[in-house]
Every structure is written in structure tokens, then in C-alpha cells.
Amino acid sequence: VLEMHHRTKRDAPSGTALTLAAAAREARLGPGRASGAPGVSAAGALPETAPAGARRDGEIGFAAVRAGDIVGEHTVLFTGAGEQLFLTHRALDRAIFARGALAAALWLQSRPAGRYGMGDVVLAKTNT
């Protein structure tokens, strides 16, 4: 999982990067089998905390860049022998985050009290 954000962002890897890695791990292991399973490391996230040496087979690694005024970019890289697949989302304007928050607030108005995440909002919008 490769991610880039503005130079003042404090966490690395970001919460979104960790969520993407968890989803990839669950897809690999199957629903409900990824909880607590090894396979996600912060290798490469920060030079001062990156472990030395190669990652283990099947382990999901991270690379984090903090530079300039980058709004946000996340790439999930899938590799195989002689091939690579990059899936990238790039936020070019922080206004998209405000639009997402407003859409979530509107969606919540018609829901019973409970704990929801943005995944619930996105799934509801794609199923309508």
C-alpha cells in the first residue's frame, strides 16, 4: 500500500492505508478470517521505524510519503511474476471530504441509532 499526504500529516501509515491493507488481507484469507491474522506491517512507513530486511511471503507492506501540499493519494499494488496492477485514488481538493461528510450526515438522518462507518454509506449508495 503506497500513500502520499501533505508534509504536516502526523500519522504514517494513514488510517485509510491501514483500512485498505485490512481489506486486501481479508480478501486473501476470506471473510472473518483476517481478524488478528499476521500479514500487515509498517515496513517502509517511516525510515526511523522501518524494520530491516525483506518482508515475509504474503505480508502486506506500506510506503508513506509526506511532502508539500499533497491532499491525499492511495495506491494498492498487486504484483505477480512479471506483472503489476496499480489501483490509485488521488484527492485533488479537500472539498471532496466535505461533500462526503455531508452525504454521510444526510444518510444518517433516516437511520436508527447505532454505529456506522463510511463503508455503510458507500454500500447503501451503491445498492440504491
Role assignments for model-derived ranges:
Residues 1-128:
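C-terminal substrate-binding/catalytic lobe of Rossmann-fold NAD(P)-dependent oxidoreductases
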